[in-house]
Structures are given as C-alpha cells and as structure tokens.
C-alpha cells in the first residue's frame, strides 16, 4: 500500500551504505527494486520507475552528484467516509491512492533548504535563519517555512538539504496534493536530521501546524494522517494529539468497486475563509448543546 516512505534506502537499512546518484540509479534498475515497484504500483510499475529515474537525473543536473542521495515517496489520499469530522474529535475512513509525490534528496551541509518542483516549475531556496511567514501567508514557500518551524517548535532538528520533486497527485481534486508534499518534506527532514525517530502522528501535527499558522487555514489532521500512514484506515480523533489508527484489509477491486477521481480544473485557493468557517460553525452547534465538539454530543 502507499504511505510516506523511503524507496531505495529501505533496501540498505542494515548496512546504510552511502550511494551517490549513479549508484542509486544502478540500484533503481535492479531486479529487487523492480519487484518492489511492482508491489507498490502494480501495472504502473514501469512508468513510475521512470519517474524516479527522471528525478535522479533532475537532481544531478540541478545540484551535481551527492555522496548519499535518497528517494522518497508520499501518496495522495481520499476520504471514503467522514469529512471535517476530525475537527469534531470524530472518526473517519480514509485511504491513500496510487498517485504520489516523489523526490530525490540529499543533505547539503549548509543553512539553506533548496527545493525544485518539476511539476509546478518552482525553484525555492529558504534560509533556516529566516522562517517567518510572508504577509500574504500563502504559497509553497510559506508552507515549507511552516514545516521547518513546526519541526523546531516541536523539538526536532532541521538542516540544509537539496531536493528535486515531481508529483502526479492531482491538484484541486480533493486528494490532498498539499498534504502529500508536506509528508514528503517531513520524511526528508526526519531521515536526514532526526535519525528516523519520528512517527506518522508527529508528521501530521507538523503539517497541520504549517497550514494553520503559515497559511491561516483551519486544517485538521485527516489529510496528513491518511497520506503518512497509507492503505485503507480508520482514524479516531477522540484524543487529537494521539489519534487511534487501525488498518483495514479490504480489496475494493475484488468487490467490483472503483474510485473515480475527477480533475475539476478549478482551484480552491480563494476558499480558505469558507473552509476555516466550517469547524467554527460546528463548534457553535456543539456549544448549543453545552459541549466543546460534536463528538461529545449524544445522538439522542
């Protein structure tokens, strides 16, 4: 199933041998990686393997070779049931999808984070000494700054790294292209500077912090949790700081069901105020019943 993960490094966790771009490309062409790609992408293994080759080439062209470059993947997500219920400390049924954000990255031993997005034609450099949001509080730069600040305020380490990223997670289609990107960056920061000690819940809270504080968007934890954990899952947000996640073993294809995603061609960048109003309106309803959130209100 899809979840935020390292792609090549999983094969060398025990030995942790450093590999440069050429060596990583060679590993990418191995039979072992072929089997993993087929497990992850099914019939789309060949075309998706080409995406990883492309980001490696893009990384080398942009940043030169590196003593240790790693490949990362983070999927988009879909809500099967439950929308905005995370704001109410309720339950959701969600799943990751086979569209993902992938990237090649390596530490650059500087005080700068340099990210190139092939998909959105962006070349971003952020100084770790300047993580204040812009006046506008919007866009990729603010989001990345929010993630970096979220790591710092949560007691985690950050540092300079280079990344070359591409994504086929459709924007404006309700599959969380932003959360997919957030979890990818969190995975890079965790791997490079925190010895991979962080868990998915920590990722999700940092992604939520970035959107809440640096985008002024009242996001919950659903999107980030679904992208980070992967597969078909239920999440109970009765304790938002420690949501309870359970995986569900169910094959929709075996039941003759397919999920159809439609790219509307219409963004929602101008709807942040309306989006943020939803949890506030729900809390007003809960307050009417003398409660803080709707999960505390009896159905009777």
Predicted features along the sequence, with ranges:
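Phosphate-handling active-site elements
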Residues: 153-160, 189-203
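Structural signature of FAD isoalloxazine-binding scaffolds in flavoprotein oxidoreductases
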Residues: 91-109, 229
């Amino acid at each position: 199933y899809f979840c935020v993960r390292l792609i090549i490094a999983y094969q060398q966790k025990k030995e942790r041998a450093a590999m440069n771009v050429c060596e990583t490309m060679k590993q990418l062409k191995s039979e072992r990686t072929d089997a993993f790609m087929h497990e992850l992408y099914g019939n789309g293994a060949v075309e998706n393997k080409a995406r990883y080759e492309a980001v490696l080439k893009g990384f080398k062209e942009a940043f030169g070779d590196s003593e240790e470059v790693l490949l990362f993947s983070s999927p988009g997500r879909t809500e099967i049931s439950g929308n905005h219920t995370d704001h109410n400390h309720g339950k959701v049924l969600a799943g990751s999808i086979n569209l993902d954000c992938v990237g090649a990255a390596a530490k650059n031993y500087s005080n700068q984070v340099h990210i190139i997005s092939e998909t959105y034609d962006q070349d971003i450099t952020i100084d770790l000494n300047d993580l204040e949001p812009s006046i506008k509080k919007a866009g990729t730069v603010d989001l990345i700054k929010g993630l970096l600040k979220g790591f710092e305020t949560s007691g985690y380490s950050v540092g300079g790294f280079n990344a070359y990223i591409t994504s086929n997670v459709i924007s404006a289609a309700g599959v969380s292209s932003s959360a997919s990107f957030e979890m990818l960056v969190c995975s890079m920061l965790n791997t490079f500077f925190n010895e991979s000690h962080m868990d998915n819940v920590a990722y999700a809270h940092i992604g939520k912090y970035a959107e809440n504080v640096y985008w002024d968007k009242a996001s919950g934890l659903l999107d980030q949790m679904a992208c980070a954990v992967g597969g078909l899952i239920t999440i109970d947000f009765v304790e938002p700081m420690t949501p309870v996640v359970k995986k569900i073993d169910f094959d929709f294809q075996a039941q003759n069901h397919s999920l159809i995603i439609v790219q509307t061609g219409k963004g929602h960048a101008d709807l942040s105020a309306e989006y943020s109003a939803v949890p506030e309106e729900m809390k007003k309803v809960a307050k009417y019943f003398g409660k803080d959130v709707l999960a505390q209100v009896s159905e009777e």
